[in-house]
Design a protein with these regions (language model features):
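Active-site helical microenvironments for divalent-metal-assisted chemistry
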Residues: 1-210
């Protein structure tokens, strides 16, 4: 299991990432911005997600500026940060990568918004695609954590619909990534995570029929 998945958002970042100056600064800035936010899956500190994305990119051999963008990839969507803040602190390349994987909230409708995001990422280059893949791996893992609550919790129909929409987006994202980054270990890892999720869906469907 990745080191990142054990830190609970409270311990120091791994030594391997501390040696990357831009990443180190980005992780600390992200922790400040995401303070008090929690993950939907399990109520853990939200910072676990960008930390995991950064670590996945590090393991895949991404350069410092891409890993830093991984740490910051949700700050435009989920905090008060604006692109100018990122350009000032981390440079235009990091800011552009974060923007490439940030949704346009002006687009109404889940499917339309996610479709626009995939097109945006596809046009943003290989580094943005790597970042997008790492994000989807982490999100797929979170969706797996949610499965128990979806199966047993209140509001089951709404939760099931949301899960189906998210899984469809992840599958379409995988298809894009397989086309653009066919040899990336991140893409292979995403495929494995989605296979695991699909098996869980099949098991729940069989249980419901019985």
């Amino acid at each position: 299991m990745d080191y990142i998945r054990n830190v609970r958002g409270t311990r120091r970042i791994p030594d391997s990432l501390e040696r990357l100056p831009k990443t180190k600064a980005a992780l600390r800035y992200a922790r400040q911005l995401h303070a008090g936010q929690t993950r939907r899956a399990d109520g853990a500190p939200f910072i676990l997600h960008p930390r995991e994305v950064a670590f996945l990119l590090y393991r895949a051999g991404a350069p410092d500026h891409v890993i830093a963008a991984g740490a910051l990839h949700d700050v435009i969507e989920k905090t008060t940060a604006v692109p100018a803040d990122l350009r000032k602190r981390f440079g235009s390349t990091v800011a552009a990568l974060v923007l490439a994987v940030s949704e346009d909230e002006r687009i109404g409708g889940y499917a339309a918004r996610k479709g626009a995001l995939r097109t945006q990422v596809a046009n943003a280059g290989e580094e943005a695609l790597m970042l997008f893949a790492a994000d989807k791996i982490s999100k797929a893992r979170e969706l797996s954590l949610e499965d128990g609550g979806v199966a047993a919790g209140p509001g089951l129909p709404a939760k099931s619909r949301l899960r189906k929409r998210r899984l469809a987006h992840y599958q379409r994202s995988l298809a894009l990534l397989q086309e653009r980054l066919p040899d990336s270990p991140l893409v292979a890892q995403l495929g494995a995570e989605l296979q695991h999720l699909s098996r869980g869906t099949s098991r729940r469907a069989a249980t419901a029929r019985n």
